[in-house]
Swiss-Prot record:
It comes from Nostoc sp. (strain PCC 7120 / SAG 25.82 / UTEX 2576). Its cofactor is Mg(2+). ATP binds at residues 55-57. Its EC number is 2.7.6.1. It catalyses: D-ribose 5-phosphate + ATP = 5-phospho-alpha-D-ribose 1-diphosphate + AMP + H(+). This is Ribose-phosphate pyrophosphokinase.
Amino acid sequence: MLSSATFKLQPTATGLTENHRLRLFSGSSNVQLSQEVARYLGMDLGPMIRKRFADGELYVQIQESIRGCDVYLIQPCCQPVNDHLMELLIMVDACRRASARQVTAVIPYYGYARADRKTAGRESITAKLVANLITQAGANRVLAMDLHAAQIQGYFDIPFDHVYGSPVLLDYLTSKQLHDIVVVSPDVGGVARARAFAKKLNDAPLAIIDKRRQAHNVAEVLNVIGDVKGKTAVLVDDMIDTGGTIAAGAKLLREEGARQVYACATHAVFSPPAVERLSSGLFEEVIVTNTIPIPESDRFPQLVVLSVANLLGETIWRIHEDTSISSMFR
């Protein structure tokens, strides 16, 4: 279901006029999210033609003058990631050549973020390559949400604003008034994320699932570090891809005596067989955001989808007005 519980902000982005020269455009990957962001900002999405030629090449044309404007292009690089990334690059290039004063690539989900380093010889660091492409296309700034690896910010030599979906998720969890919460990291690498999450939930205790990955998209869960018996376990991650890690973690938590298990993640990648794993009865709820569009065929009764449109809209407005973004997350 799409929950009405969203991150509540005191809207500063009201009464936009032509004099502000702020323009908002959407790629094809998540038009609904872009429309919600535009609604928060009290403006319309800019007109743009997007089409595909017979040979598969993409074409983009901005349908209004943006000369001297502060332009924001919303395009999560989700499946099909290569098409959506290429479309973003073309949009950025089109705006630069149209003499926009500043072009900001708003990337709610940054594709290729898991390829942030070499883990074996003769591999590409694709996250860095994507950063180079976006910069060379002409972007002046990037706004992204919940990067898989925070150090990706350092791959850019242009301003990079990194925002978090946790306020939206926390607002919803708080509204449920859950008791005896323990926040669980599905692996050692996510401990910092889970610890920050737990601190916002009245310093809830922390547990860690110790696992060792045998191959890509395959994880072997070994044991739980921490006490989860009789508690409401909240598994926290940045994304759910095939669901193998988080489902195996939930199964182990149940075996260790957890009373309830919730899953929270910003990005719902949901590659097969994620839906099958997540809807198998292991979770009370699977709570995600709408950074990536979720088709009806991938929805199931335990799924809760929260909107990050207000958060993104407020961030865009603050960038445009040169005001603080970090104060939103204190």
